[in-house]
Amino acid sequence: MRLSQSLFVTLREDPADAEIPSHKLLLRAGYIRRIGRGIYAYLPLMWRVLQKVSQIVREEMNATGAQETLLPQLQPAEIWQESGRWDTYTQAEGIMFSLRDRLDGELGLGPTHEEVITTIAKDMIRSYRQLPQHLYQIQTKFRDEIRPRFGLMRGREFIMKDGYSFHASEECLKKTYADMDQAYRNMLRRCGLQFRAVEADSGAIGGSGSQEFMILADAGEDEILYTEDEKYAANTEKAVSLPVEAIASPFNSFEKRETPNTATIESLCKFLNCSPTCVVKNVLYQVVYNNGKTVLALISIRGDQDVNEVKLQNELTKLAPNYDAKTVISLTVPDADAQQKWAAKSLPLGYISPALADDCIAKNKAVSGEFLRLVDPTAATLENFVTGADETNYHVLGANWGTEFKLPPLQVDVRLAKAGDRAVHDPTQILQTARGIEAGHIFQLGTKYSEAMGATFTDENGKEHPLVMGCYGVGVSRLAQAAVEQSYDENGIIWPVAIAPYHAVVVVPNVKSEEQMAAAEKLYADLNAAGVETILDDRNERAGVKFKDAELIGIPFRVVTGKSLKDGKVEVVRRKEGDRQDLDLDAVVATLKNWVEAAGQ
């Protein structure tokens, strides 16, 4: 490629709407252009990067025996209603674009393809002899993000590899899951990225277990908790830990005490001169299920701990059948306006007890008349604790479960693990924190979709069983931007060689010099012929502009046909290392070819 003939425009200033370094650099370097909110065009340089990432992904998938396919982006609502996810994706999470066709049929633009692939399996797989099967695609996906941000990191349109496997048994699924774990590690290593595999929440996709592959970067949206012995790592949404030991309560007898202006844990503990580990705090949540039913959930947890709302939503979803519902579409801490819709009286927020009376809820068919009471293990084990008295400016001290308060029967872990907690597998290990960008996610789905949609097979005895499923996703466009977030400097992008749009750029400082142009043309031809993908900067621009652009776009190796030509040499610069050296003209091709090959090992 010759830059003089290319659509190539760089910016000297950071775009105003770009927030993180990788987003700024991809815009400035002419890789992408914003078309609308969360919608970007992939320009020629970016498309080459995406093709290289896709090819690495494709090679690793094919090596496991997976078969590439292409599934429809338009998906009928009926198959999503059959799986039970239509309300979740169009109402609760609200991330699916939905539309109606001219026949008034309801459709969705695919954010994922479990329903489509299960429909295919239902129609085509009959016998255990056809199993296992593993299909994947690399395709554009659509998600109506509430707040698209960070360029390709969280867009409304993006490129993804999604794969789906079908099995006769959990054991067979686990083998494919392990194969995918290794394949994903291979993909990320080949792309030149530093990453960490972590336990993760399965979210709306569901299943019994999942693992995320996080690219380590300060701008990552996800927090990772891990131990230095490398035996535990998890997304905070999923992480478990041992909290610090509770300090013994100084209150040995039960009493109600006036505690003015102590609606927060901090102010209460300061007033009582006690540790927050002695306090049971009670957090009220308003839960709305997909059938419109509102339930008020009262969560009791130790005073120094916070509620993990992902864990809580998962538990509330399990309880949905108790309310003739399937899923949670809203989980909020109700403000004063929200309370007016269901509260029979003003609630003493900040002073609530675990026994807040059900008559606080006004009679309303759309609202459950009883509080759903859950207790976290950190609170369930406390003795002589402090908690609210259900009266503003009053708390009770020295309270105990079984005497002053009935212990809720639902004891579930809804605690947010955090850095500084002790590890479950080894309490001497302290959880550390890092930021990460989710580039891949693998799931053991089990029979969630096959049971819901009637996708079955017959075993060797002729007995019918639901197909056991797994699914495996890689964000191709996100991975490409994450590589930039992990590798850049003050001058621009530093692409890993494996996914750089080109391996080398030949820069002609003075295009009017016949000697410089002749040497550059020969190097350009010889390098490409040797398999070193090379662009030629033959623009009629100042040398300084060309050098700045070469650094900005992040091509790994730069060859300059400058002043040293008189000695039969050219300057070669390695972008990552930043070193410069003069090489004989006849040594350039072999040297760069060796560097490219070494980077791929």
Curated annotation (Swiss-Prot):
Gene3D superfamilies in the record: Anticodon-binding domain, Bira Bifunctional Protein, Domain 2
The keyword Cytoplasm appears for this protein: yes
Coiled-coil blocks: none
Pfam families in UniProt: HGTP_anticodon, tRNA-synt_2b, tRNA_edit
PROSITE patterns given in the database record: AA_TRNA_LIGASE_II
UniProt GO MF annotations: aminoacyl-tRNA deacylase activity; ATP binding; proline-tRNA ligase activity
Main subcellular location of this protein, as a coarse class: cytoplasm
Record EC number: 6.1.1.15
Domain of life where this protein originates: Bacteria
GO cellular component: a single term: cytosol
Subcellular location: Cytoplasm
The UniProt record lists the keyword Cytoplasm: yes
Keywords from the UniProt entry: Aminoacyl-tRNA synthetase, ATP-binding, Cytoplasm, Ligase, Nucleotide-binding, Protein biosynthesis
Family in the record: Belongs to the class-II aminoacyl-tRNA synthetase family. ProS type 1 subfamily.
Notes on the domains: Consists of three domains: the N-terminal catalytic domain, the editing domain and the C-terminal anticodon-binding domain.
Subunit structure: Homodimer.
Known role: Catalyzes the attachment of proline to tRNA(Pro) in a two-step reaction: proline is first activated by ATP to form Pro-AMP and then transferred to the acceptor end of tRNA(Pro). As ProRS can inadvertently accommodate and process non-cognate amino acids such as alanine and cysteine, to avoid such errors it has two additional distinct editing activities against alanine. One activity is designated as 'pretransfer' editing and involves the tRNA(Pro)-independent hydrolysis of activated Ala-AMP.
NCBIfam families: PRK09194.1 (NF006625), proS_fam_II (TIGR00409)
Name this protein carries in UniProt: Proline--tRNA ligase
Organism: Picosynechococcus sp. (strain ATCC 27264 / PCC 7002 / PR-6)
